Amino acid sequence: MTPTKAKDGKTHTDGRASIEKLKRGFAYKLFYQLGVWTLNSSLNDYYLAVSYTVRDRMQQLFINTMRTFQQKDSKIVSYMSAEFLMGPHLHNNLINLGIYDQIAQAAEEAGLDLQQIIDHEEEPGLGNGG
C-alpha cells in the first residue's frame, strides 16, 4: 500500500506549513514519539521533536517523487561521494522545504528558541575515523 497525504492531524504533511499544524506536530512528536511531557523536556527532546516534524514533511515529498518515478517508469542514475561533508541537516532542510519562517514562528509561539535548537544538532561525522 502506498502512503498518501496524511489528514489525521498527526504528521502534518499536507504541504501547508501552518503555524498551528507545526506546533501540534512538535507537541505530538514530543509526547507520542518521544514519550516526554513539555514540563520535563530537554533541549535534545525539542531538537528531536522539531526534526521529526520536518522529516515527516520531507518523507511525504520523497514518497510523491518515488510515486512519480514508478508511474513514469523512470531510470535513476546515482553517484555517491563521501568526500564532501554537508554539515548539520536541520537548518538546510528548513530552507530547502521553504518552511524556515513558519517553523521559527511556531517555535517562538511554543516558547522555543529555534536557533538554539538548530545549534544543538551535532556535526555528522564521515564515519571513517577522520
Regions found by a protein language model. Give the residues of each.
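A conserved ligand/cofactor-binding region detector
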Residues: 1-130
